[in-house]
Amino acid sequence: SKTTDIGDSSRALTDEEKAKGLEENIVAIDGIATITNKSNKVTNLTKDQLAKIYTGQITNWKDLGGQDEAIVVIGREAGSGTRGAFEELLGIEDQCQYAQELNETGAVLAKVAKTSGSIGYVSLDVLDDTVSPLQLDGVEPSEKTVKDGSYALQRPFVMATNGKISEQSKQVQAVFDFINSDDGQKIIEKVGLVTPNK
């Protein structure tokens, strides 16, 4: 109905949305770090192994070179943008078998930190030393690897417009001018997101 100037999304626009004239303006990128309890000796998973853990096809760390311990699968609640992006990036939407679903990132971090054998996922910006980040296909989750595209678990933060930014009102153009300014980019980095390569 074109009553909104800017529509925010924590995922890429679909082809259907683009066909309706929406322009995908990526303003930031969020890396999704897979984390495990610090006692776990496994440091790297393939994308396929990660998908199999979350769908219940791999249930013990010994099958991945770790100790003989059940994998405790922790995730976010249904409707979470992080969960939606994580499952979509792995191609496992609506197939996950969670031992526990938690309503906030901090709770996932705390649960994985205190639960032996656990695995979870959080936004890169909250990653701390209470847990161990897992490499994905040999790539460490970091701002650098998200920015250069080598780390696969990442999602764009999009501000969609009806048509190109240059076709928008002066007020809308001013919003994007600020976002793309040095001050705007500093804010994006300060909140823990990665600025896209321009």
Enumerate the predicted regions with their spans.
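Exported/periplasmic ABC-transporter solute-binding proteins
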Residues: 1-198
